[in-house]
UniProtKB/Swiss-Prot annotation:
Location of the protein in the cell: Membrane
Transmembrane residue ranges: 243-269
Occurrences of domain Ig-like V-type (ranges): 27-140, 148-234
Protein name according to UniProt: Butyrophilin subfamily 1 member A1
Leader sequence segment: 1-26
Keyword Repeat: yes
InterPro entries from the UniProt entry: B30.2/SPRY, B30.2/SPRY_sf, BTN3A2-like_Ig-C, Butyrophylin_SPRY, ConA-like_dom_sf, Ig-like_dom, Ig-like_dom_sf, Ig-like_fold
GO process annotations (BP): regulation of cytokine production; T cell receptor signaling pathway
Organism lineage: Eukaryota, Metazoa, Chordata, Craniata, Vertebrata
SUPFAM superfamilies reported for this sequence: Concanavalin A-like lectins/glucanases, Immunoglobulin
GO cellular-component term (any): external side of plasma membrane
Membrane-side (Extracellular) residue stretches: 27-242
B30.2/SPRY domain ranges (all copies): 285-479
Keyword Disulfide bond: yes
Amino acid sequence: MAVFPNSCLAGCLLIFILLQLPKLDSAPFDVIGPQEPILAVVGEDAELPCRLSPNVSAKGMELRWFREKVSPAVFVSREGQEQEGEEMAEYRGRVSLVEDHIAEGSVAVRIQEVKASDDGEYRCFFRQDENYEEAIVHLKVAALGSDPHISMKVQESGEIQLECTSVGWYPEPQVQWRTHRGEEFPSMSESRNPDEEGLFTVRASVIIRDSSMKNVSCCIRNLLLGQEKEVEVSIPASFFPRLTPWMVAVAVILVVLGLLTIGSIFFTWRLYKERSRQRRNEFSSKEKLLEELKWKRATLHAVDVTLDPDTAHPHLFLYEDSKSVRLEDSRQKLPEKPERFDSWPCVMGREAFTSGRHYWEVEVGDRTDWAIGVCRENVMKKGFDPMTPENGFWAVELYGNGYWALTPLRTPLPLAGPPRRVGVFLDYESGDIFFYNMTDGSHIYTFSKASFSGPLRPFFCLWSCGKKPLTICPVTDGLEGVMVVADAKDISKEIPLSPMGEDSASGDIETLHSKLIPLQPSQGVP
């Protein structure tokens, strides 16, 4: 009878241990990357390793290497299969997974035929169930250029110009000139210009006036590789002419004539520049008037846009009027719906457009990251599908201190100033979507001749949390007190426009040469 309690205790202990086993499989882990940057030479292969701590198997985990954004990524593997559709075009077909030690939690991504554009920071991301971690891997790309070549040119003044040229360097190399005694001296001018592959072509020139410098060498160094290439040239003594009194007299006369010529050219140039400036200012004023006419006519097609809560990502909080939205760290408990975004922090407008022209404005304020535009009603809302026109998105964004049009290769937008309010104009029949900076009325970007099929809806996205929301502006903000000036040269000819977009009595021909201006400064389009 004394043995029974011990047997019961042992059985209970065994059951407790077995219950803990499933928890061990999904235990938390850390991802560790290399402490030092990975150095790779252009044209060769590079491996970006990461490992798990503790050393548990990475089989079956989601493995992702990416750069600035999670998607599209450099490499994605899910359940042991590469997901090429989620990879960046410039890496597709050049990356593979090195999984020799995957059972010990050590894996790497191999990049074949490294390019200069591959240089920079990468992140490796491991996910298993609800547990995920990431680490940073730095890749340093280097290329040793061609042997330098020195060309020699004797100038009319008797000075000798040497130009040292070499191609195929990365990153930008250092150029140094030396005398035959090993004394270093700087270049008179240098240029380092990248080619289509991102490799630098180096040109450096010097002027030699001292006839004792018979041998001169040009040395180009790659500081990252710690290697250099050098070439030496000998300057014949006959290249240094001897000065005579008559040569000095001729030189003085030439200098005087040169100064007189320069003075005459200078005054002629100033007169030409002044006249050119006047013509340019007149042309610029007309161009600005026409550009203002485009977006102010767009406001005549203004629509009242509101946010659709059924499409909002759980981290997006909509205001009661459905006009403003902000991103929060906390996740709301919302019903799962097929029309709700579950990965990208986005929300659609309630309004769906299948024809006609439509215009609305969004107050972005001083927020540092957002995306605004139009999307098809049936776009993929689950997962990280790239936001491109091919996938049904036509949008512009502010991300990483830069403005971009979300084309397949992301088009940079060189704006004169940051817009605090953005206007969006959709012309369904022509397939055009225009974006305007309503701070100064300038044009931002246009998606032209798009092929629309089915309903289109306004689209909004936030990339970071913040107290300041993204706000859809009321329709009346841009329509009060708008006037048309029939002739840009005569501002006294003002013709009012109907807020509903009806042309005035002057007709369409007169409107083509009109400028929309606010009746009062406080009533214009912001």
